Amino acid sequence: MRIGAYEDLDNLNPVLSDELFATNVFQLLFSGLIDYDDRGDPVPDLAIAVPTQQNGGISRDGRTITYRLRHGVVWSDGAPLTAADVKFTWEQILNPRNNVAYRYPYDQARSIDTPDPYTVVVHLAEPSAPFVANFMRNGSLGSIVPKHLLDGYPDLNHVAYNTKPVGSGPFVLVRWDPGALLDLKPNPRYFRGAPKLAEIQYRIIPNQNTLLTAVQSHSIDIFLHATESQYAVLKSVPGYRVTAVPNLDYEHVTFNCAKAPFDDVRVRRAFAYAIDWKRVNDDAYLGVDVPGMTDQSPAMWSYDPHVLPYPHDTAKALTLLREAGWSRGPDGVLVKDGRRFTADISSVVGNGTRLKAEELIQQNLRDIGVELGVRNYPANLLFASYGADGVLARGRFDIALYGWSFNPDPDDTDTLGPGSVPPYGVNYTFYKDADIARWQEAGKTHYSRSERVGYYWKIQERTHDAVPFHTINWQAPINAVNTDLRNFRPVPAVADFWNAYEWEI
């Protein structure tokens, strides 16, 4: 079975990568304590049950979480997988020497006990609903790695394991040619039994038009994340079905709030008014996806329906820029203190939809006197960690346009919390707000949705006014799938390969 994707992977160690396409590959190679099914609900993976207060997995005070592991699970090399591996993975995520994308919510655990090989007891400083939703969930930061192979290294940044991983998932890696191919075969030791597919070839094809041609020639079986402009063409290709399942992935524009002139809220708000968000969504994304403003999906219980995208208002944008000290120069370009208003927008190379969006934004900003250049990067450079000199993590950008995958819990501490600014996390806005930090803290200490929702509404209202980012849309990723492939069930949360052990062709 052949999968085609347009983004390369930075490495194959789930401790060190949370890139969107990598999460799918991790679901093939690894296991977590929990996973998420095609309804977006948490389901057990290596854990026997998802902890709740009702089943006794969460203590009455909310500070102790107990996971009970399946018996008889082994790594693909035959070594037993035990509670010690879970604790070791947690320790590596918190190891400051490791180039980890973010450490939240793992840093909320005060300690972890392993009273026996099949029990993991997590002690939290405070109750944390997002911890339970995210701790060791497969396909993201938290896919469990083997202690017996990695223990003893001062850090995991450059170990051979990162290109030749041993996992506990349904498949094992046979070969990886970076930028070209991952070849995977069934794991005969997989705890659910060997998967039904004889082989998976994960092909890296950096251009989405080339991927479309591959579908038309029937040389791939799954085309991951096609562009909206390819939707109608893919629907006409015989032998393929096209899925577009709304999920928690969102396209957004992020402003570097630590870098002038975007450290001025008036400039950010001016850009929000200047950009015609509806046109960007309709013309670049063909209106397939749901327009948005904040980082809470309309499909989530935490969504505030009163917070709407900024209207297109060039006059309002110019007024705000004048208040911020910018005025038109003789050639029409804005000038302040002798400095012309020039900036770059950055995204991933090879994505036609995002390039179209960048060009539309470029046109809108030209109308208000901003010279906006387009400076795109390969995914493995744009999204690399702080320690690996990533463009976003190091703040070497003005404006960035990219997709992000929100987790099933509304807590956004990792992407918006003041304590998650790189190198401590993935708050690539570099925006810091003490009120938001307080609301995030209050929101995560309750397990009841009714007690939490008000805090997330406050955060959405604040980010609307401060504009550290502006969501373009919530996506329904378009996948073209060979009709001979059975049991491919995309997920509205996390990643799409959660049940790869059930696939048949």
Model-derived regions, located:
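Alpha-helical secondary-structure segments
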Residues: R2, T82-T89, P117-H123, G169-P170, ...
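Gly/Pro-rich hinge or "lid" segments in bacterial periplasmic/extracellular proteins
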Residues: D37-D41, N138-P195, E199, N209, ...
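N-terminal lobe/hinge region of extracytoplasmic solute-binding protein
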Residues: G4-I58, E91, V166-S168
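Detector for C-terminal structural segments
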Residues: D177, L181, P186, E251, ...
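Short helices/loops that flank or line small-molecule/ion binding pockets
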Residues: G78-P80, D85, N209-S219, S236-V237, ...
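Ligand-site clamp/hinge motif
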Residues: V159-N162, N187-V233, A357-Q362, E371-G373, ...
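Surface-exposed binding/hinge segments that line
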Residues: R103-G152, R175
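Aromatic- and charge-enriched surface segment that lines or borders ligand/interaction sites
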Residues: V50-N99, V121, A214, P261
